[in-house]
From Swiss-Prot:
GO annotation, cellular component aspect: membrane
Region forming the signal peptide: 1-17
Name of the protein in its database record: Ig-like V-type domain-containing protein FAM187A
Family: Belongs to the FAM187 family.
Species this protein is from: Homo sapiens
Taxonomic classification: Eukaryota, Metazoa, Chordata, Craniata, Vertebrata
Ranges in the topological domain labelled Cytoplasmic: 398-413
Domain of life: Eukaryota
Record topological domains on the Extracellular side: 18-376
Length: 413
């Protein structure tokens, strides 16, 4: 009996030791390349992405990430402290923030939040001494010129383009989940620009032979110019899925409802948390869905009206005052009184939050340079003063010239 128990304990200890060895040798199974290569990766602007450091020597306790705009550039950014301990929370990152405030290092991987097109370049995983183990060629494609294609209207994506041996095309991601449930919703898939050519640099890793994203550093300048007009796409179609039955009423709220219902009236209880905001008449407003990222399926409703992308997506109509951008934010330009109401936000097919908007035409609001409208007013005022000053100086300069050379007596004082 004791022999059997001892055998079982030794067997269990051996399994545990095996698991520990496996965890410790995770980087031994992926040897670092003898010649540094660049793995191509493409993303849409405002998205967050992760770059794993797939290999490193066992004796290296922490990695340091470096960034170069172009290979061999004399200017290299160090993206961490030299112990690899820089941490950034995604919720604290704002659109347009500097790269050094939009990244994080976790488990040797580099996380970049709300990437911008200027973040495109080469990322190196290495040591504080500048020894590189793994590298990425990252292409962040701008969403400003993004083209929307609506399948329900019979529209088709861009056709492939051919320029001799150069083949330019769109590669689509998977469809998102339906953005609403219980009612007609929408789902979409993002398409990024890729090209195929035998003239690409051999130093860049390719998932498919001779195929990389259009903004890759592997693409020669002359080929990149030809592919410049092939913008990212978003393909949109309708969908309909049932809602999952969940109990959303909390016990405390339920007790209040039962108490009030005994009195004879049942109060209105919102399905989701509601936030109140009061906006000045004629000023702009941008609403973000809590916890949503650009790659999520996000939808917006105003009261009982569904704001579908087929009508409200940015770029559908240039004169739109209310629209949804490609980062899933709802924009209201020049707020009007009829914009008052509750704006509901769906995330991944679930109703998650409400935003009650009130519009006021009066009230005291201190001016601040953080307000874009205040900055615009100051800029226009300064430009006006500069123009008036330029005209004034020009007139007096001409009068002085005429007076000195007696060429224009009528201007003499």
């Amino acid at each position: 009996m004791h022999l059997a128990l001892t055998t079982v304990l030794l067997w269990a200890w051996g399994l545990q030791a095996f698991e520990i060895v496996e965890k410790e040798n995770i980087f031994q199974r992926t040897p670092c390349p003898a010649f540094l290569m660049f793995e191509n990766a493409a993303y849409l602007a405002d998205m967050s992405f992760e770059l794993p450091c797939h290999c490193k020597p066992e004796e290296v306790p922490a990695v340091v990430w470096f960034y170069q705009k172009h290979l061999g550039s004399s200017h290299t950014k160090v993206l961490t402290d030299f112990d690899g301990r820089v941490l950034t929370e995604a919720a604290q990152v704002r659109v347009g923030s500097d790269m050094l405030t939009r990244f994080s290092i976790r488990m040797f991987s580099l996380l970049v939040f709300r990437a911008q097109s200027e973040d495109s370049g080469l990322y190196f995983c290495g040591t504080r001494k500048g020894d590189y183990f793994y590298a990425y060629d990252v292409d962040i494609q701008n969403s400003e010129g993004m083209v929307a294609t609506f399948q329900d209207k019979g529209q088709e994506p861009f056709a492939d383009e051919y320029y001799g041996h150069l083949h330019v095309f769109t590669t689509f991601w998977e469809w998102t989940p339906c953005d609403r449930c219980g009612v007609r919703g929408e789902q979409w898939r993002i398409g990024l620009c890729y090209l195929q050519s035998p003239d690409l640099s051999p130093r860049y890793l390719k998932a498919v032979p001779d195929v990389v994203s259009c903004g890759s550093r592997a693409v020669p300048r002359k080929l990149r110019t030809k592919a410049r007009d092939h913008t990212p796409e978003v393909l949109v179609r309708s969908c309909l899925v049932p809602c999952e039955k969940t109990k959303t009423i909390r016990e405390g709220v339920l007790a209040i409802i039962n108490y009030v219902s005994k009195v004879g009236s049942r109060p209105w209880v919102p399905q989701v948390p509601i936030q109140f905001h009061q906006q000045r008449l004629g000023h702009g407003l941008i609403i973000s869905c809590p916890g949503a990222r650009p790659e999520h399926a996000v939808a917006w409703d105003k009261d009982r009206q569904h704001l579908y992308r087929t009508q409200y997506l940015k770029g559908v109509n240039r004169s739109m005052r209310v629209f949804i951008d490609h980062g899933n934010q709802l924009h209201i330009r020049f707020t009007q009184l009829d914009d008052r109401g509750i704006y509901y936000c769906w995330r991944q097919g679930v109703l998650v939050a409400g935003f009650r908007l009130g519009v006021t035409s009066h009230g005291h609001y201190p001016a601040s340079f953080s307000d874009p409208e205040t900055r615009s007013a100051v800029e226009l005022t300064l430009i006006g003063y500069l123009l008036i000053t330029a005209v004034f100086v020009t007139i007096h300069f001409c009068r002085c010239c005429c007076y000195l050379f007696h060429c224009c007596p009528s201007f003499s004082p």
